[in-house]
Every structure is written in C-alpha cells, then in structure tokens.
Amino acid sequence: MALAGLTLFLSPVAQAQDNALPDFGEGNAVPLSQEYYLGRAWLMQFRRQAPILSDPQLQDYTERLIYDLALTSQLRERRLEVVLVNNRTINAFAVPGGVVGVHNGLILAAGNEAQLASVLGHELAHLSQRHFARG
C-alpha cells in the first residue's frame, strides 16, 4: 500500500522533470532561412493596420521578459521582435521569424509576472516548434 502511494506521488515529479516538447518533424512549408524575412515583412504590414501600443516602459519590460524566457527555450533563432497591440482581448501570438505579439489585455489580465511569462513561453514554443511551417 505504501509503495503504491509512493509511486503515485513520484509519478508527477518524474513527468515534470521531462520538459522536452514533442517533435512533430521539421516543417517544410517555410524554409528556416526565409522565416526571419517573412516575419519582418508581415510585421511592417501589421504595424500599418493594427492599433500598436507605444509605451516604452511596457515595451522594455515585455522584451526583457521574453528574452529571459528565450535563453532557456529551444529556439534556434533568437532574433525576436516584440510588438505590443492596443487591444483589450486576452491574447498573444507568434509569427515566423521571431515576431511575438502581445495584446495589452493579456498584460492587464495577468495576475502576476509568472502568469504573463507562461503565455509568452507558450508563444516561444510555437516558434521553436515551427508550428506555422507545417502547412
């Protein structure tokens, strides 16, 4: 009985130590060499159309948080561009080439830095796993 309880207790601990993301194979819809340029072209267009939030302090804070997270991520390319969107919805997104968009609604809704970091880490995982390049 005690052994069964110990097994149940240790199982989540062992699972938590294995933090590798699943590998669904290489994306081939967009070559890695073109991602950066596609992302920057998309970003130029996006900035012309979307309500961009211009807040230097918030920009610096968000960039610092994302760059800190990127240090321990599986990203091959760490040239990241953070764009703050003036939108009250709770949302963030990732675009090829290291573009991460963050709605100010997400920042306002986050109860603390850890909650915001978890969403930003999720977006970095989209980039590292190249989900957009899978067609």
Language model: regions and residue ranges:
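Bacterial N-terminal signal peptides
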Residues: 2-9
